[in-house]
C-alpha cells in the first residue's frame, strides 16, 4: 500500500487554504469546489480539497515511481522562492522567474539555450587572463540572464512527465503547452481560476504564502517518498538517507546491481555514500 504524506483538515485551515477571492472575482467553473461565502469572500470546500489532493498525490507518486520527471511552475512573487526550494529539495526541476513561450513545445530551442548556459559557466570557471574585465562582465551578465530563465531546468534532460502549477491564471501558457504534449497537469485552483486543462485539480488558496508553502512541501514530500520506495524496491537500504536526486537514482540502482554480483545485495546509508552524492536536480542553488 502506498504511504503518502499525511495531512489533516486542521492543517489546511491553519494554512488558510480555504480562503478564496472576493465573490466579484470568481470563476463560475469553480462553483463545484466552493462551500459558501463569508464577508464577501468565497470559502473553498475543504472536503473537496482533501479528496482531490489525495488523488493528485497518488497520481504523482505513481509517475515518480516510474522515474518520471516533475516540473514545478510558479512565477508569482510569493511563490517564486518556495517553488525553487521545494523542487531542489526533492531533486526535481522548476521555472520560477518567467515562463518563456515554447519551453515545452519548442524544447529543442530551449536545449540550445541550456547548452549556451553551460558554455558560459565553463568559460567563467576556467579563465586564464585571456579575456578583459569588460568581456568577463559581459559573459557573467549573459550567464546570469540565462540562469534566471532556465537555471531550474538545465539538468532536466528532456520534457517533464508531469507539471505542478501554482496560479493557473498566471501560468496559462505553460498549461496550454503541457496540454498539447499530453503532459499531465497538477494545479492548485483558487476561486478565480479556470479548471480547464487541469488533469488533477486541487482547490485551494494560491495567493497566501502559508498555503503555497503547504502545497509545495507536500508535493515535494510525495516525490521523495516515491523515490525512496523505488530504491527500496530494488533492494537498496534507504535507512538514514534523507534526500534523494532523481538524476542520481539510476546510478544507485546500477551500483546496487553491481554489488549483487559481489558481496552484498543492498547499499547501506553508511557505506561511503555522502549526502552530497544524493542531491542534484536543478542547477540553481540560490
UniProtKB/Swiss-Prot annotation:
A cellular-component GO term for this protein: cytosolic small ribosomal subunit
Stored CDD domains: RPS2
GO molecular function: structural constituent of ribosome
UniProt keyword RNA-binding, yes or no: no
Highest taxon listed in the record's lineage: Bacteria
Record keywords: Ribonucleoprotein, Ribosomal protein
Keyword rRNA processing appears in the UniProt entry: no
SUPFAM superfamilies linked: Ribosomal protein S2
Region named Disordered: 257-286
GO terms under biological process: translation
Family from the record: Belongs to the universal ribosomal protein uS2 family.
Name assigned to this protein: Small ribosomal subunit protein uS2
Organism: Ehrlichia ruminantium (strain Gardel)
Encoding gene (name): rpsB
Amino acid at each position: 500500500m502506498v504511504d503518502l504524506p499525511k495531512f489533516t483538515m486542521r492543517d489546511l485551515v491553519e494554512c488558510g487554504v480555504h480562503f478564496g477571492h472576493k465573490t466579484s472575482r470568481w470563476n463560475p467553473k469553480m462553483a463545484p469546489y466552493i462551500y459558501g461565502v463569508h464577508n464577501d469572500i468565497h470559502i473553498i470546500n475543504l472536503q473537496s480539497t482533501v479528496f482531490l489532493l489525495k488523488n493528485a498525490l497518488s497520481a504523482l507518486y505513481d509517475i515518480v515511481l516510474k522515474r518520471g520527471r516533475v516540473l514545478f511552475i510558479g512565477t508569482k512573487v510569493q511563490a517564486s522562492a518556495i517553488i525553487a526550494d521545494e523542487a531542489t529539495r526533492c531533486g526535481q526541476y522548476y521555472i520560477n522567474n518567467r515562463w518563456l513561450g515554447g519551453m515545452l513545445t519548442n524544447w529543442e530551442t530551449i536545449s540550445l539555450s541550456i547548452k549556451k548556459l553551460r558554455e558560459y559557466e565553463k568559460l567563467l570557471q576556467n579563465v586564464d587572463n585571456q579575456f578583459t574585465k569588460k568581456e568577463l562582465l559581459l559573459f557573467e551578465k549573459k550567464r546570469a540572464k540565462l540562469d534566471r530563465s532556465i537555471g531550474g531546468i538545465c539538468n532536466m534532460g528532456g520534457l517533464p512527465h508531469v507539471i505542478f502549477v501554482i496560479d493557473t491564471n498566471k501560468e496559462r501558457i505553460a498549461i496550454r503547452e503541457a496540454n498539447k504534449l499530453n503532459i499531465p497537469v497538477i494545479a492548485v485552483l483558487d476561486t478565480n481560476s479556470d479548471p480547464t486543462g487541469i488533469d488533477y485539480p486541487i482547490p485551494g488558496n494560491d495567493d497566501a504564502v502559508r498555503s503555497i508553502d503547504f502545497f509545495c512541501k507536500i508535493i515535494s514530500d510525495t516525490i521523495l517518498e516515491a523515490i525512496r520506495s523505488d530504491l527500496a524496491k530494488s533492494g537498496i537500504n534507504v535507512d538514514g538517507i534523507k534526500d534523494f536526486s532523481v538524476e542520481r537514482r539510476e546510478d544507485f540502482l546500477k551500483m546496487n546491481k553491481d554489488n549483487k554480483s559481489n558481496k552484498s545485495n543492498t547499499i547501506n546509508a553508511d557505506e561511503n555514500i555522502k549526502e552530497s552524492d544524493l542531491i542534484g536536480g536543478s542547477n540553481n542553488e540560490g
